[in-house]
């Protein structure tokens, strides 16, 4: 397993639409293992493959709290359907938009179909934080970031803030 670099805005790769996975094999499982290790190292709760530069329809997630045992989840070729009419606001952040948080409204319940780590077909209803997180990560697979839901001014400020943070990190590393 390896920790991979997480791409940040305004990297154009983040705007690419991810492609379906043909099969769940050892190479894909290695990618998912790397993604999970990368997500944990960055203190995230979800990560899409495109965020590590791989345009495949793969998501890893772990919504366990810091005082709970890890509960990793894997979603290959996920498909969302039947969103609830009820929208709820949640404050979202993103490993690809570090230090930026804002409130986004999303359906609080949604149906999801996917392949798991072993390639088994699964389906379930996502609610609450799980629903928010899976929709956020699914947006990544379509080349959409949570800041795309914000006003143009807020989006520009977010990108500038990330550039400043990244520049500061580069200076500190030198």
Curated annotation (Swiss-Prot):
SUPFAM superfamilies linked: Peptide deformylase (SSF56420)
Domain of life from the UniProt record: Bacteria
GO biological process, one term: translation
Top enzyme category: hydrolase
Catalytic activity as recorded in UniProt: N-terminal N-formyl-L-methionyl-[peptide] + H2O = N-terminal L-methionyl-[peptide] + formate
GO molecular function, one term: peptide deformylase activity
Active site residues according to the UniProt entry: 137
Phosphoprotein listed as a keyword: no
Cofactor annotation remark: Binds 1 Fe(2+) ion.
Swiss-Prot/TrEMBL keywords: Hydrolase, Iron, Metal-binding, Protein biosynthesis
Binding site for Fe cation: 94, 136, 140
CC cofactor: Fe(2+)
Statement: the UniProt record of this protein carries the keyword Protein biosynthesis: yes
Enzyme Commission code(s) on record: 3.5.1.88
InterPro entries according to UniProt: Peptide_deformylase, Peptide_deformylase_sf
Pfam families to which the protein is assigned, alphabetical: Pep_deformylase (PF01327)
Alphabetized NCBIfam families for the sequence: pept_deformyl, PRK00150.1-3
Functional description taken from the UniProt entry: Removes the formyl group from the N-terminal Met of newly synthesized proteins. Requires at least a dipeptide for an efficient rate of reaction. N-terminal L-methionine is a prerequisite for activity but the enzyme has broad specificity at other positions.
Family: Belongs to the polypeptide deformylase family.
HAMAP family per the UniProt record, alphabetical: Pep_deformylase (MF_00163)
Name the record gives this protein: Peptide deformylase
Originating organism: Maricaulis maris (strain MCS10) (Caulobacter maris)
Gene of this entry: def
